[in-house]
Amino acid sequence: MLNYEISGKGNENLVMLHGFMENLMIWEDLEARLSNDFTLIKIDLPGHGLSKMYAEIHSMELMAEEVKKVTDQLGLKNFHLLGHSMGGYVSLAFAELFSDDLKSLTLFFSTYFADDDEKKEQRQKSLRIIKEAFPTYVSAGIPNLFNPNEKDTLEGKMNFAKKIALSTKNEGVLAAVKGMIERT
């Protein structure tokens, strides 16, 4: 079973799926803003945070099926699903497989479009770099996720994101990249 945390006191349930090289801690800022209106279910995706590995390749569908096990265990129906980046890809797979469970679907910095050939090639290259120099991959890549005009004011958030990324299991990162390459 995937690791998850529940917080908030709202009448509606919001399941939150983090992005690549993140974990449920990434939602701290939003948690304070949403916890009066929603009961928040923050989930660590496979190979991230405290969740275990499930396969050599974590397809978006595999991850969605593991999320479904959590929502079933909690008896959730008619809930809101929020996905950030890769969590958005997982959310889309969840919506395809289990649409009857959802009240709404929200994507942050994600897309329903599959990767084009250029993006798939970038992901293939990243596999090698992750295997050979994961800390360098994190140090170089995380700042690119932030607005370049605000890097000075967002330095604390960038360092937080780097810390979370570096705590992610290397095998989990590789399995997620392979899953994103396969995404259609």
Task: Indicate where each model-derived feature is located.
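Conserved alpha/beta-hydrolase catalytic His-Asp/Glu region
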Residues: 114-121, 132-184
